[in-house]
Amino acid sequence: DRDARTVHGRRGDGTAFAVPYDRLLIATGATSIRPAIEGMDLPGVFTVKNLEDGRRIKRFLRERKAERAVILGMGYIALEMTEALVDLGLAVDLVKPRAGLLPWLHRELAKPVRELLEQRGVGLYDGYRVDRISADGDRLTVHAGDLALSADLVIAAIGVRPCASLAEQAGLELSVGGSIATDR
């Protein structure tokens, strides 16, 4: 109740509660964006955002003895996953639809990152839109136009979507991308 500056809800046992507030912080987090690509539901295809996602991937790596990975995306999370997988001895390819690695960085700042990735044997395929992911047994193939990349696992690390339904239900204004609008 924004007018009364009170949060109303129910506890786990079903009893109601009301908590008054002077200022309210809504920190409901975000979920991984799951691209609308055929094959995202195949075994060995993951999204990644949090520790539990990392644990699922680690478990998969142990069970399958993976050697090759394709990561969809070239942002911070994709680069963190790339570093971890390369350190574990996997060959890694990165794919994304728009040209440029870390496009929000100045080109001169992104250049050494690209060079380091190339030195570590990482395949960089920017400018390729993934059409689908297919499976032949345990082997996955990422299809992007005329490009076909083989992998034991595929990780979508293309960003997050804000969990703003509570704010929306409370009548708060949402901003670009569905995040909660702020006064700052």
Protein language model features and the residues they cover:
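Glycine/Thr-rich phosphate-binding loops of Rossmann-like dinucleotide-binding domains
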Residues: 34-35, 79-81, 151, 164-165
